[in-house]
Structure formats: C-alpha cells, structure tokens
Amino acid sequence: MNRRRWWRSSERRWRGLVSLFLSVLSGFLTALSMPGFLSGALIWFSLIPLLYAVEGRGVWKRAFLSFVYFFTHVLISFFWVLPTLTENVPLVFGRYPSWLGIVVFVLMGIIEAVPFLGFGFLSYFAPQSIVLKTLYLASVYTIFEYLRGVGELGFTGGRISEALYSHTGLIQIVSITGTLGLVFLIVSLNVLFYEFLRRRKGLLIFPVIFFVYLLNSSVVHLLPVPERGSFKVVALQPNVPTSLKYSVSSGEMLELLESMTKDFHGSIVITPEAFFLEDVRYSQKLRELSEENTFVIGFPADNQNSVFVLEGGRFRKVYSKVKLFPFVEKLPYPRVFGVFSFLKGLSYYEPGRNFSVFNVGESPPLSVQICFESYFPEVSRAFVKNGSELLIVVTNDGWFHYKAALLNHFVQGVFRAVETRRQFLQVANTGITGLVDEYGRIVDALPLRVRLAGEFHIKARKGETFYVRYGDWFFYLSVILAVVSVFISRMRGERNEGIGIRL
C-alpha cells in the first residue's frame, strides 16, 4: 500500500513538472515569435504546449500554469528592459543599486502576468466540442489580453498580435477589430491545432496554415501600390547616447540642432522626445534658427512632457503627454507603490488634458504623441477622431541597447497605421526613425544609431475606420461569445473540460 501511494505521489509530481515545463515552453515559443526574435510564424503553435499543460488540471493549477506561461513570455520578450534597469537608469540618476533593477524587472513580469491567472481559471469551464471550445478559449484569452492594457498599470506590449506585424495581408482586419481580432485569430488556430493533434488528425494543420498564408498573400496583392505623399518633413535622429544625453548642456544640443539643419531651408523639422531637457522658450538663438526652418520640438515645460511648434520666432505648445509612463513619469497608486519612487526619471509630470490636433504652416491637420503612447491604440484613435490626418510619435529610445527593443516599439506604428488608415511617422533619438503607410507597410527608415536628418514625404488621409469609430468593440463581442459558448454547451448537456477533476 505504501509503495502504491509513493508511486502515485511520484507520478503526480512528475506530471506537475512536465506541465510546468510545457507552460515555460509556451512562453519561450511565444517570445521567439515577437518582433526582433526568431519568426512570427511560431505564434500559430506557441500556445499548444500550454493547452497540453492545463489539460485535465484543476482550476488553480490551470491558473498557475497560465501565469507561468505569460510570466516567461514577458521576461524573455522584454529582456532588453533588464540592462536599462540595472545599468542605464542607475548610471544616469543614481537613485538605487543595480541589483534592485533585477527585482523591479521580475516584479514587472509578475504584474503583466497576473491577468492570465484569470485565463487559466476560466479555461476550466471550456466546452468539450471543438467549435465551442475554440470560440470559448479564444474569447477568454482576448478578454484578459484587453484587461491587461487597462488602468494605471495597463500596458499592451507583448500582445501576441505583434508577431504578425509583417503579415501585411492578415493585419488589415485591425482596421475593423483592432489588434484584439488578431489575438482571437491566433488563439483560435492554436486551440484548433491542439485539438487536431489530440485527436490524431495533425495532418489537417497543413491545409489550414496553407490557407492562412494564401489569404495573407492574396490580400497583399490587392492593396494599392504605395504612393509618395505631398507633405514633406525633416526628421532628426541625433543619436545621442543615454550616457551623454543627461549630461550634455542645452547649449551643446542647440549647436547640434543647428549643424543638423544647416542644409535645410523652409522645412518642417521634427525632433525626438525631450531633445532639450529643460524649458528653452527663452533661447534667442533657437528663435533665430526658426527664421530658417519651422521646428516641432520636444522638451519639458510647466511640469509636463511637451511638444512645441517654433515658427517665425514664436513658440506654441501643441501637445503634452497624456499617457504618462508608470513609475518613471508618474507614481501610480502612491499608497501601494510609494516604495518604488526611486524609479522616477527627470520628474513626475502632470498629464496633458487633451489630444490636440494642430497645423504647421500650410500642413494638413496633424498630431504628435510621445514615446510609449504609441503602444496604446486609444491615443491614436483620439487624435484621428479629433481630425488628425497623419500620426507622428517622437521618442527617446536611446535607453535600450538591443535592436529587438527598438523594433518592438517601432512596429506599434504598423498597427496604429492600419487601425486608423493614417500614415505613421516615428522620430527617435537613436532609431528607429521611419514611416509606415496606412496599410502597415514600412515605406522608409533611417539606419539605426546613426546621426542623420531624413526627409519623409507623407500622405494625409481623412475619414474614420470602423475601429476608430467604435474602438475595442471586439472585447465586448468576446465576452458575449464566451458566455454563449458555455450556455450552448450546457443546453446540449455537455460537461465542461474540467468536470470530475479535483480543484
């Protein structure tokens, strides 16, 4: 009897270790599908190990395994944040030791993964029929992916839809559904492929994948040929390393601005975020430069992270950042997270009050968002609803050493462009500075980590897409589909996947 009990206990431990390994494997494969890693095609299969891991498990084990999956995905996908937290920020601001950056990095992974406890928990109630199960699990995953981006700590980075940024045909659906539609599609195919394998019909995977890529290719060939726009701007990529940026004086940056624009006359010149680190509205030299060119220039002022237009010697503030970055630009929930105030950047800022659209000379109505605001689709939506005919983001990505970090940020513009059918220009300190057209095609980009001033010709567009008009309606559809799937399953007398399994 004791031997039998020992055997059963060993079997449970072994199965638990296998399930844990499969969850980690899912996170690893999902990370490898992200921009700058191995291949976006991995996303069609990356959730299959997780689905095997949770099969036959109780609700709490499912919740834990789902958490482990997304925690692994975040730590690998955002590995480039670690040297920023352990090297760059302590070096520049000197507020904490490097080892504490590791703690913060792990806590970031925990915060991002917490919503997926809910996915694992609710996966217990999945119907057994293949169609209802696919609809249910895809809907539940989509629900928690949306919730992860909501609130003071909300962030959309690492969304599995990012793996498809180069699948130009498939991503056209985001003009209707937003990226949540892609999330739903990805999870649906993973569940479908898992069921094929479980039922020993794995060969059916190949025609489905063939159809997906045939559809992608067909849509690409139907898209209009890229056109050169009539609105010309000059984007500056000053390539000032973080190790120098916070020690260089405004006078030196002014000299750099002058040298980079000396060959341009009568142009609209756009600088990255915080080109100057102090309010320079009283600089006579800068005003003199504006007699030659018009500047869209970023610097902090009035306790806000702002963008100004300098035209004919006159400054006007055109936008202040609304979505401030947690812990660096604002302290969310101070009573809870007050201990993390050491992560503060230059200052805690006041958020801007509106998503303002403006003109520069004879330009079409345009808008400028700042840094990681491009991760949030509601920002671009708000600008377009306010009349913006093209989208610009200015950023300082010099904090990050790795190309994967720069690409991850840049591809957010691919999705924002398709969602809104607006051309999207990113202007970055070290790169990537480039232009994406309204169909998500990367039209032009400057070389990374090279000091350059590049001319970009942008095409303005009017009108509102379905997504701009109705926003994240797909979230509500996912809620309805999840409820209806369970309801139909109960009406048919089906048992859910977890019935008979211990909690």
From Swiss-Prot:
Membrane-crossing residue ranges in chain numbering: 13-32, 34-54, 63-83, 102-122, 124-144, 173-193, 203-223, 468-488
Supply the InterPro entries for this chain: Apolipo_AcylTrfase, C-N_Hydrolase, C-N_Hydrolase_sf, LNT_N
Pathway participation:
Protein modification; lipoprotein biosynthesis (N-acyl transfer)
In the record, what terms sit under GO molecular function?
N-acyltransferase activity
Q: Coding gene? A: lnt
Q: What are the record keywords, sorted?
A: Acyltransferase, Cell inner membrane, Cell membrane, Membrane, Transferase, Transmembrane, Transmembrane helix
What is any one of the record's Gene Ontology cellular component terms? plasma membrane
Q: Entry's PANTHER family?
A: APOLIPOPROTEIN N-ACYLTRANSFERASE
Q: What is the originating organism of this protein?
A: Thermotoga maritima (strain ATCC 43589 / DSM 3109 / JCM 10099 / NBRC 100826 / MSB8)
What does the UniProt function comment say about this protein?
A: Catalyzes the phospholipid dependent N-acylation of the N-terminal cysteine of apolipoprotein, the last step in lipoprotein maturation.
Q: What is its EC number?
A: 2.3.1.269
Question: Primary place of residence?
Answer: membrane
> What Gene3D superfamilies does this protein's entry cite?
Carbon-nitrogen hydrolase
Q: Where in the cell is it found?
A: Cell inner membrane
Q: Which residues form the CN hydrolase domain?
A: 231-460
Q: Which family does it belong to?
A: Belongs to the CN hydrolase family. Apolipoprotein N-acyltransferase subfamily.
Please report the name of this protein according to its UniProt entry.
Apolipoprotein N-acyltransferase
Pfam families per record: CN_hydrolase, LNT_N
Gene Ontology annotations of biological process type: lipoprotein biosynthetic process
The record's NCBIfam families line, in alphabetical order, gives: lnt
* Top-level EC class: transferase
Q: Where is the active site?
A: E273 (proton acceptor), K321, C371 (nucleophile)
Q: How does it sit in the membrane?
A: Multi-pass membrane protein
Q: Which PROSITE patterns match?
A: CN_HYDROLASE (PS50263)
